[in-house]
């Protein structure tokens, strides 16, 4: 097994692109291990409905990235207090779905620090009832990776805020995340532990006393990783557009009237829109409903679709920004 450095990159779109690139393009006769740390971001499972997993208003206000990964499972929050690890190897027939095989050295490293960690259920590492690590896998032909999070010292308030869904009724066939009590590993340590030291302890558990052999990515590798990031992980189509069909319902009682929004959304675009309420406006809201059909379901695109319409004409004295926020 060889170790791959990510050059301390914290851009989640690059780190996920690097992981996929290594899986699909590096020499298959080798196995690889890598770490990466992301700036504040939500990493959504491959089969999830992104809008159902995130508090979009909050993450927009706090510049939190949302990126879809190629493995299944639920949405997770990453920040610089969270260490991600990934084993990339062949599926020998006994590896895919075998979370114990890949989490065992991680659990051993934690136990060496006095943390009473164990693999529980299908894919979580816990201390008692508290989850400190979630794991997921993906397989491409005969190659696979098993990757996971290690919450050393994450901002737990942000974990709750960023993953709290907006107060909308969204019904879809996406895979919903299961929320558990989460905790930082630091809570179970007697002394502070820096992430760089944590990395060394894990590497020693995996490689033993032998020198850690490193596989260095070339300039060409990094160019290809950047291209994959641009073409896939930085696109709305990948991160949001893969959403299954869903029904969006939201309502709010403003000082000047009640407004209810109902959208049918498919692959991120509004297919059908209805607006109800007891507001006092002159215009026929059918104009707005028609303007919204085909629009991407997010604040920016709804704002653009309605840019030529005077919403006061339709809703009376209700704030334009608040109306568009309600729709998104």
Swiss-Prot record:
Q: Which SUPFAM superfamilies match?
A: Class II aaRS and biotin synthetases, SufE/NifU
Q: Which residues bind ATP?
A: 69, 74-77, 131
Give one Pfam family, short name only. Answer: Lip_prot_lig_C
Q: What is its EC number?
A: 6.3.1.20
Example GO biological process term?
Answer: protein lipoylation
Going by the UniProt record, its keywords in alphabetical order are: ATP-binding, Ligase, Nucleotide-binding
> Which residues bind (R)-lipoate per the record?
131
Q: Where is the signal peptide?
A: none
UniProt pathway: Protein modification; protein lipoylation via exogenous pathway; protein N(6)-(lipoyl)lysine from lipoate: step 1/2; Protein modification; protein lipoylation via exogenous pathway; protein N(6)-(lipoyl)lysine from lipoate: step 2/2
User: Which source organism?
Assistant: Staphylococcus aureus (strain Mu50 / ATCC 700699)
Q: What enzyme class is recorded for this protein?
A: ligase
Q: What biological function has been recorded for the protein in this entry?
A: Catalyzes the lipoylation of proteins, such as GcvH (SAV0833) and GcvH-L (SAV0324), likely via the ATP-dependent activation of lipoate to lipoyl-AMP and the transfer of the activated lipoyl onto the lipoyl domain of the target protein.
Disulfide pairs here are none
Record's catalysed reaction(s) = L-lysyl-[lipoyl-carrier protein] + (R)-lipoate + ATP = N(6)-[(R)-lipoyl]-L-lysyl-[lipoyl-carrier protein] + AMP + diphosphate + H(+)
Q: BPL/LPL catalytic domain location, by residue?
A: 27-214
Cite the GO molecular-function annotations of the record: ATP binding; lipoate-protein ligase activity; lipoyltransferase activity
Q: Name one GO cellular component term.
A: cytoplasm
Q: What is this protein called?
A: Lipoate--protein ligase 1
């Amino acid at each position: 097994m060889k170790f791959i450095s990510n050059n301390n990159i914290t851009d989640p779109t690059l780190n996920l692109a690097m992981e996929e690139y290594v899986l699909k393009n590096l020499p298959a006769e080798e196995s690889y291990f890598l770490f990466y740390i992301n700036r504040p971001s939500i990493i959504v499972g491959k089969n999830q409905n992104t809008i159902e997993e995130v508090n979009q208003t909050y993450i927009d206000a706090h510049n939190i990235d949302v990126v879809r990964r190629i493995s299944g499972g639920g949405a997770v929050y990453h920040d610089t207090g969270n260490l991600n690890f990934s084993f990339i190897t062949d599926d020998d027939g006994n590896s895919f779905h075998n979370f114990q095989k890949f989490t065992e050295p991680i659990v051993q490293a934690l136990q060496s620090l006095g943390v009473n960690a164990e693999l529980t259920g299908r894919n979580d590492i816990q201390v008692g009832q508290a989850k400190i690590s979630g794991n997921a896998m993906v397989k491409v032909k005969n190659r696979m990776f098993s990757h996971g999070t290690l919450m050393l010292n994450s901002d737990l308030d942000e974990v709750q805020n960023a993953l709290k869904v907006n107060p909308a009724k969204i019904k879809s066939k996406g895979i919903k995340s299961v929320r558990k009590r989460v905790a930082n590993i630091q809570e179970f340590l007697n002394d502070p532990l820096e992430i760089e030291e944590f990395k060394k302890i894990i590497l020693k558990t995996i490689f033993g006393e032998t020198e850690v052999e490193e596989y260095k990515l070339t300039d060409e590798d990094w160019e290809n990783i950047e291209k994959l990031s641009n073409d896939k992980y930085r696109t709305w189509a990948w991160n949001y557009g893969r959403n299954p069909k869903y029904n969006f319902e939201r309502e709010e009682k403003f000082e000047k009237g009640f407004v209810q929004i109902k959208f049918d959304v498919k692959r991120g675009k509004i297919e059908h829109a209805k607006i109800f309420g007891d507001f006092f406006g002159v215009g026929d809201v059918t104009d707005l409903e028609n303007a919204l059909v085909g629009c991407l379901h997010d604040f920016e695109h709804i704002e653009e679709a309605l840019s030529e319409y005077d919403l006061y004409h339709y809703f009376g004295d209700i704030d334009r920004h608040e109306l568009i926020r309600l729709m998104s």
